[in-house]
Amino acid sequence: MSNIEDRVRKIIIEQLGVDEAEVKNEASFVDDLGADSLDTVELVMALEEEFDTEIPDEAAEKITTVQAAIDYVNSASE
């Protein structure tokens, strides 16, 4: 999985224990995928590790959907 979008989706599936079909771009981690605040912190940490980047708290608070995570990683890797 070299594609950023695929890698982000894989992390979300593993961290939240959700089915691949549920991980749509517009899906909210909390409202659609059942994540709680601890899940979202762990998700951000997993993204940081996978993409070897640091996500500041103010940016992490804005990463609330699958697409937001993909967009952030894309912009951080440019």
Curated annotation (Swiss-Prot):
- Main location group: cytoplasm
Post-translational modification note: 4'-phosphopantetheine is transferred from CoA to a specific serine of apo-ACP by AcpS. This modification is essential for activity because fatty acids are bound in thioester linkage to the sulfhydryl of the prosthetic group.
Query: Where in the numbering of this chain does the Carrier domain appear?
Result: 2-77
**Pfam families (alphabetical):** PP-binding
**Which residues does UniProt call coiled coil?**
none
UniProt keyword list: Cytoplasm, Fatty acid biosynthesis, Fatty acid metabolism, Lipid biosynthesis, Lipid metabolism, Phosphopantetheine, Phosphoprotein
Pathway membership: Lipid metabolism; fatty acid biosynthesis
Q: Which GO terms describe its molecular function?
A: acyl binding; acyl carrier activity
Q: Name one GO cellular component term.
A: cytosol
Q: Sites of the modification O-(pantetheine 4'-phosphoryl)serine?
A: S37
Subcellular location per the Swiss-Prot or TrEMBL entry: Cytoplasm
Superkingdom per UniProt: Bacteria
Biological process terms from the Gene Ontology for this record are: lipid A biosynthetic process
InterPro entries under this entry? ACP, ACP-like_sf, PP-bd_ACP, Ppantetheine_attach_site
What function does this protein fulfil? Carrier of the growing fatty acid chain in fatty acid biosynthesis.
Q: Which HAMAP family does this UniProt record tie to the protein?
A: Acyl_carrier
Q: Which family does it belong to?
A: Belongs to the acyl carrier protein (ACP) family.
Q: What is this protein called?
A: Acyl carrier protein
Per the UniProt entry, what species is this protein from, by scientific name? Photobacterium profundum (strain SS9)
Primary gene name: acpP
